[in-house]
Amino acid sequence: MFDISFSEILVIAAVALIVIGPERLPKVARTLGHVFGWAQRYVNDVKSDIQREIELDELKKWKASVEETGRSIENSVHTELDKFRETVEAGAEASAMPPPTTAPAGESSPPQNSSPAPAEPAPPPVQSTKNSDPAGPGVNRERETAE
């Protein structure tokens, strides 16, 4: 973390032993260890907070991008739906209008009825009872007379 070599640490320890003295040196070393540990934890906490903020920033950007894409898709769907609605309404209006007549100016045509006239049912066929064969038309009569 501080780029201090082992020989530099030995020099610092020797100076501390001379200045502080052998009785208080263990207590001071323990206190310095706690302070360095606290500083390292604080630095690590700050790093992790910064990392979380960066990730949140990236997620917010990604979320905004996804929302923008969603709005774009929604707008295009609404646009296409409106076009489709206009087409359907135009088709409904066109089918509701009567067809234009194309008769020449000199001739007059009778008004055309859009529905066909109802047809009358045809009368049932009348069968003649004279010379009619009750057995039917396909029966061989020669056999009956020969017996």
From Swiss-Prot:
Biased composition (Basic and acidic residues): 67-88
Pfam families linked to this entry: TatA_B_E
Family matches, as Gene3D superfamilies: 1.20.5.3310
Keywords associated with the record: Cell inner membrane, Cell membrane, Membrane, Protein transport, Translocation, Transmembrane, Transmembrane helix, Transport
GO molecular function: protein transmembrane transporter activity
Recorded GO CC terms: TAT protein transport complex
Subcellular location: Cell inner membrane
Membrane topology of the entry: Single-pass membrane protein
Ranges where the record places region Disordered: 67-147
Gene Ontology biological process terms in this record: protein transport by the Tat complex
Keyword Cell inner membrane: yes
Chain segments annotated as transmembrane: 1-21
Biased segments, Low complexity type: 103-117
Superkingdom in the source lineage: Bacteria
Family: Belongs to the TatB family.
Function according to Swiss-Prot or TrEMBL: Part of the twin-arginine translocation (Tat) system that transports large folded proteins containing a characteristic twin-arginine motif in their signal peptide across membranes. Together with TatC, TatB is part of a receptor directly interacting with Tat signal peptides. TatB may form an oligomeric binding site that transiently accommodates folded Tat precursor proteins before their translocation.
Record text on subunit structure and interactions: The Tat system comprises two distinct complexes: a TatABC complex, containing multiple copies of TatA, TatB and TatC subunits, and a separate TatA complex, containing only TatA subunits. Substrates initially bind to the TatABC complex, which probably triggers association of the separate TatA complex to form the active translocon.
Name recorded for this polypeptide: Sec-independent protein translocase protein TatB
Organism: Nitrosospira multiformis (strain ATCC 25196 / NCIMB 11849 / C 71)
